Amino acid sequence: MKTGYLYLQTHPDHPGMVRFLTRDTLPDTDPASDSHEPAVRYVARFSDIEAAQMHVQNSLHHQLIDIDTHMYRASLPEAMAVVESDDLKHERVWLDPALGEQELGLMEQSIRTRRNRSRNLDRLWQGVGLLFAALLVLRMLGLF
């Protein structure tokens, strides 16, 4: 396992798209002097950065634009929610202070939606497992 930072980057020339990038060290979060430069908008630290990349890919695989540049078609609040709602242990290190209340509200709403969906899916699979365990016990007892 390799510790690292997962960060989200946006670019004014690519609205509605986000890049998920990784580094071993904390990325530079100073705002770009040129408004046409990419900007870091969110940083999280993971104890297993490769697993974090895999989880992002699994969550947003339908929105992947370019695997080489790690570019996805997603809003910034949705992209941040993908990271925040993941069950992997992580720590939010930095959040762009220029984010508005509306974007933060959308992120929180998306986090709740993703966590509820994951919880419901877990319950479904636990129910399926219990059903098959019960059928196995009935089969062993010769009742089924």
Report each predicted region and the residues it spans:
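Non-catalytic accessory segments flanking enzymatic or RNA/DNA-binding domains
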Residues: 1-17, 23-144
